[in-house]
Amino acid sequence: MAPSHVDKVNTRTWSASIVFMVLTFVNVSVHLVLSNFPHLGYPCVYYHVVDFERLNMSAYNVMHLHTPMLFLDSVQLVCYAVFMQLVFLAVTIYYLVCWIKISMRKDKGMSLNQSTRDISYMGDSLTAFLFILSMDTFQLFTLTMSFRLPSMIAFMAAVHFFCLTIFNVSMVTQYRSYKRSLFFFSRLHPKLKGTVQFRTLIVNLVEVALGFNTTVVAMALCYGFGNNFFVRTGHMVLAVFVVYAIISIIYFLLIEAVFFQYVKVQFGYHLGAFFGLCGLIYPIVQYDTFLSNEYRTGISWSFGMLFFIWAMFTTCRAVRYFRGRGSGSVKYQALATASGEEVAVLSHHDSLESRRLREEEDDDDDEDFEDA
């Protein structure tokens, strides 16, 4: 079947979005490379934010001065930036593969607006725009770290985390219910069936980045708060654990309540959350200033509680995943229900359309008779 006008418009818009995505990726890559050289317009290197040698857990914040707080050290920030860039590269390659398979294929499919259906399921223009926002906000986040502005670091970390979250949700749900998602999957072009596994890998990779960004945004928020309010550094270190626990629990619950229906294999956030916990441990173990005071007991208990929460939700996800694999009939039953409902709706729509056409023909016959 020849592509319709809707398919042509949607394909061109989607292609333009992918072109902008590639340009944004190149821009962010060049920015990260150049930001390692302070004499090229950047005041400082982005990966050296906090001087842990000057950190004092018992000291209060001094207004108009930079107060060191718990944050990622230089090695962690470089690894974080490189990993995020690899995630961006993988997502960009995924979109390019989808674009080649949809735009360059000779068999356009037998369904009306087949390309539009495929683009909507694999990642439409809005999802591509959200990914571009995620890359842009990450670039601004590293730029604020280069200027060492605590308030802006906290703000851009939160904005980047929000954009990455919305992009992940759009990749998982495609803005539709579970039954509608199953129906669109059943109408997917046969040549894209294998790419769905690539899409599952991309979803989990983005969730790994999201899990580690939970640690980053918790540190950044407390880092900004601690440099703008008269609080102790030790209290802000403990606040990092509280913020991390709240955000991670919300995401764990969303995965178990909603997202697991769309993508069965979802261990990416759990893996990223584990790496985030390790990212919290490293600077605390590396620098004795964290443990040589009265906050040692509170920090130890906080670590224990966070690892317990992580282990509990990870075990729950593993049990539900393997139990779901054992009962394969549920998936096909839901697919049949979704298809039946969709066919019933389409049949009702066709009957109404046929009735409307018959009425118009009768009216035309009456007018011809009157003219005669």
Swiss-Prot record:
It is a multi-pass membrane protein. Residues 360-372 have a biased composition (Acidic residues). Residues 35-79, 148-151, 222-239, 286-298 are virion surface. Keywords: Disulfide bond, Glycoprotein, Host endosome, Host Golgi apparatus, Host membrane, Host nucleus, Membrane, Transmembrane, Transmembrane helix, Viral envelope protein, Virion. It is found in: Virion membrane; Host Golgi apparatus, Host trans-Golgi network; Host endosome membrane; Host nucleus inner membrane. Residues 1-13, 101-126, 173-200, 261-264, 320-372 are intravirion. Belongs to the herpesviridae glycoprotein M family. Envelope glycoprotein important for virion assembly and egress. Plays a role in the correct incorporation of gH-gL into virion membrane. Directs the glycoprotein N (gN) to the host trans-Golgi network. This is Envelope glycoprotein M. It comes from Human cytomegalovirus (strain AD169). The gene is gM.
